[in-house]
């Protein structure tokens, strides 16, 4: 498996949308399997991020298109310009890796937003 040591990204979030993540920048890792593009790359955050679909300790992400729906027509442009921005715009609390974040997202959005902003300030 080839390993690319990280990419500094600032997802292209529509500034007209009110995403709590729009001010953050994260270092991510991408691992390409030998079967790429027929098998999806593994994508994870190296920078801490408080998100229902990211394991807070490992940075592993739960994103259906990378785990189940990947096809060879997708590439890194899709990941950076579509999948990750949508992932940050629309957290899915129904399929969490971070249960604490998912519960706050569903039950106390103000506290959830505060935790996101604290992590952005601390780590980004």
Stretch-by-stretch model annotation:
Residues 29-41:
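Proline-anchored loop/turn motifs at beta-strand termini and strand-loop-strand connectors
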Residues 18-22, 35-37, 53:
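Short glycine/serine/proline-enriched coil/turn segments at secondary-structure junctions
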Residues 13-16, 29-30, 48-50:
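Eukaryotic intrinsically disordered and solvent-exposed regulatory patches
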Residues 2, 25, 31, 103, ...:
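Glutamate identity and glutamate-enriched acidic tracts
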Residues 6, 10, 39-124:
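Domain-scale recognition of soluble eukaryotic interaction modules
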